[in-house]
Amino acid sequence: LTPAAALKVSTLNFLHRVRPTHFLKKVLMTNRNPEALQAFAGKVSNSVTGGLNCALTMIGDQLGLYRSLAEKGPMQSGGLAEATHLSERWVREWLYQQACIGQIEYDETADSFFLSEEGKAVLAQEDHPAYMGGMIQSVVAMFDTVEHLPECFRSGLGQSFDDKGEGCACGIERMSRKFQTDYLVPALLPRLDGITERLTAGASVADVGCGGATSTIAMAKAFPASKFIGYDISLHALERARANIAAAGVSNIKLHNPTVDPLPEDSSIDFITTFDVVHDSTHPRQLIDAIKNSLKRDGSWLCADVKGLPTFAENRRDNPMATLAYSFSVLVCMSAGLSTP
């Protein structure tokens, strides 16, 4: 059998083993609405498939499989394994899964695999606005923490960002990197009255919840006369920030952990930024008050945060991102916000 034929046969055999026709018919017949039961079971099955695919997509991202396909074009499993210095058998099975789910294209005649232009953008080109490797990485990093969620539900206390591990911090940093490096300084800051002029002249800036400091670095490079302080309570994020700052070669950034070195209360800061921070805060009112007290009377606060609709009913009906947003909330955002009493 060719690999393509073997894939079809093995898939059919697997489906026959796990879902025998006579058994499925019997189950459906016991339900008053077998079509609805089958549709609902299919919906849940798709969710299971999506969860498994997240893990395998992260593998493709971390091992450079997508990048190699994007750069070298159509390849058979042996060629991709050789290009990435990986085991052919493992690469072959991964390619079969990726082709079945539709993330990688398959040419039966040539028995080769390749990425569409859309696939390259979403899976291989980290500088593309549609790239999703960071999101996938952060989602997979949450898997290890799921076993702790039952206790969160019982106690009401959530998990901090550091409880999610370094992978979550890295994934979130990668998710926001494109905006912070390519959009923040050239496109967003000029829309704020007087900000670029003030930063050019030299200002005191606090990037609160700086994460890996990609936004801090972008501003520090563009405005060398200004002094920047990145604040974050995540030790994983601060470690990444130190490494990123060193790699960028900027000298006008300092890093503080606000649990040790909080924002100043002397109204000495010209400009404060928060990017997707307030909704994750354990005490948002205290954070807002601290920001207010640290700003000069003519200072400015750039607050970018999650955009939702006023009610759950509206979000469920009209917000296409509602499912993703609520999923992230339970696993990360609300959990972090409830991580301290």
Residue ranges of model-derived segments:
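Short acidic, hydrophobic short linear motifs in intrinsically disordered regions
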Residues: 74-82
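A short glycine-rich, Lys/Arg-flanked "PGG" loop and its adjoining helix->strand segment in the class I
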Residues: 285-297
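A short SAM/SAH-binding and catalytic strip from SAM-dependent methyltransferases
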Residues: 270-284
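A short acidic, Gly/Pro-enriched loop at the edge of an enzyme's catalytic core
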Residues: 261-272
